[in-house]
Swiss-Prot record:
Official protein name in the record: AP-1 complex subunit mu-1-I
Hydrolase in keyword set: no
Region of interest (Disordered), residue spans: 240-262
Lineage: Eukaryota, Fungi, Dikarya, Ascomycota, Saccharomycotina
Native organism: Saccharomyces cerevisiae (strain ATCC 204508 / S288c)
Domain MHD: 175-473
Key word Transport present: yes
Length: 475
């Protein structure tokens, strides 16, 4: 694996390092800023892996830092090293809050202690913050004088010697609850005519565990991970609602999406893709029986991530048109529609409509929400706090446009299309509670603590929201 890990400033000069093996020269990191500078002169795109004299420099950039791992073997697992570097930054963020050059210089003692624990002889070891915080705190350690105290001080925490290393024993809560959120983020690229060019669903199952003892949880989703949904003319997206239940009971009380009301609709089977589980999940149980069983860490964590590449109808749709007037002004008309079921409501909707860089003196008319001109983004921001399904709202904006000028013949020089005026796509943000786009549903969330046998309260919530790229291309 890695022979050494370095923290370098924005120029590539080392701030702090930890060598795990002696198979690289001490001067190896001195070549990194030179290699970095040479690549920056050649191109703006710098690969995350550099090679020099048989050494591989694998690095990530975070704020004003480069976190670098140097390896000697070409057969090293690059993906594992990059995963470790990202996890290392995550651990440091939990300790230092902000990982940047100044915080590295101010907390080198703590960082060295962490580097000794997260990796041993170049092989990743403990990367769970909750485990590390059991015996590495931000306070300085006092010198231990007696040999007996030294033996006790070097003894590993109980969690490290347990089969469940991510959860220590003896956890107690006054009220035993487990909160499960299924959050689906929609990335979509659409044309102005409504054609979907690209769409995907990024799912994240988040858990907040407030359970005593060593509970064993069993999570069941519809049809063991391969589930069905029904398509009709109104929408191709089934909704879901948040539910609560007592211990060992089903958490989904609403009718199944395979009910008789869907008999005349088209049935489509959907299978989760790119599944990624937290280490607490028993993978063999899932592979054999498609049941998710786990002993959760205490507090918040991501239980599962998944992706679906499937064509879906736009949830929030906008039709943007531009009219150019002869007096150096343009008028922008936008109609927005919530293409979701009427019982669902989109919240915190934000529609960012691009305008020319030299636009000025805006005036607005709108039916709902609020409008704001954002000159630093050359855009108009339309905010709608509540957008019920099936509703359609409209707005219009009139702006001055000095770039519309007379040509040599005395005629106005007019842009030929919306794309020539509104450079850039329309960006949309939204959130729809109690709603899933893919159709995934929790059938049950059972909690069992064999020793304490307490009453527990599982809670399930569904949220669909826009992803990082939900845009309408104006071409």
């Amino acid at each position: 694996m890695a022979s050494a890990v370095y923290f370098c400033d924005h120029n590539g000069k080392p701030l702090l390092s930890r060598r795990y093996r002696d198979d690289i020269p001490l001067s190896a990191i001195d070549k990194f800023p030179i290699l970095l500078s040479d690549l920056e002169e050649q191109s703006n795109l710098i690969p995350p892996c550099l090679n020099h004299n048989g050494l591989e420099y694998l690095f990530i950039q975070h704020n004003d830092l480069y976190v670098v791992a140097i390896v000697t073997s070409l057969s090293a697992n690059a993906a594992a090293i990059f995963t470790f570097l990202h996890k290392l930054v995550e651990v440091l963020s939990d300790y230092l809050k902000t990982v940047e050059e100044e915080s590295i210089r101010d907390n080198f003692v703590i960082i060295y202690e962490l580097l000794d624990e997260v990796m041993d002889y170049g092989i990743p070891q403990i990367t769970e913050t909750k485990m590390l915080k059991q015996y590495i705190t931000q306070k300085s350690f006092k010198l231990v004088k007696s040999a007996k105290k030294k033996r006790n001080a070097t003894r590993p925490p109980v969690a490290l010697t347990n089969s469940v290393s991510w959860r220590p024993e003896g956890i107690t809560h006054k009220k035993n609850e487990a909160f499960l959120d299924i959050v689906e983020s929609i990335n979509m690229l659409m044309t102005q005519k409504g054609q979907v060019l690209r769409s995907e669903i990024i799912g994240d199952v988040k858990v907040n565990s407030k359970l005593s003892g060593m509970p064993d949880l069993k999570l069941g989703i519809n049809d063991k991970g391969i589930f069905s949904k029904y398509l009709d003319d109104d929408t191709n997206i089934p909704s879901a609602s948040a539910t609560t239940s007592d211990n060992n009971t089903e958490t989904d009380k609403k009718p199944s999406i395979t009910s008789s009301s869907a008999t005349n609709k088209k049935k489509v089977n959907i299978e989760l893709e790119d599944l990624k589980f937290h280490q607490c999940v028993r993978l063999s149980k899932f592979e054999n029986e498609k049941i998710i069983t786990f002993i959760p860490p205490d507090g918040k964590f991501d239980l599962m991530n998944y992706r679906l590449s499937t064509t879906i109808k736009p949830l929030i749709w906008c039709d943007v048109n531009v009219q150019v007037h002869s007096n150096s002004r343009i008028e922008i008309h936008c109609k927005a529609k919530a293409q979701i079921k009427r019982k669902s409501t989109a919240t915190n909707v934000e529609i960012l409509i691009p305008v020319p860089d030299d636009a000025d003196t805006p005036t607005f008319k709108y039916s709902h929400g609020s409008l704001k001109y954002v000159p630093e983004k050359s855009a108009i921001l339309w905010k709608i706090r509540s957008f019920p399904g099936g509703k359609e709202y409209s707005m219009s904006a009139e702006l001055g446009l000095p770039s519309i000028s007379n040509n040599e013949d005395g005629n106005r020089t007019m842009p030929k299309s919306n794309a020539e005026i509104l450079k850039g796509p329309v960006q949309i943000k939204f959130q729809i509670p109690y709603f899933t786009t893919s159709g995934i549903q929790v059938r049950y969330l059972k909690i069992n603590e064999p020793k304490l046998q307490y009453k527990s309260y599982p809670w399930v919530r569904y949220i669909t929201q826009s992803g990082d790229d939900y845009t309408i291309r104006l071409t």
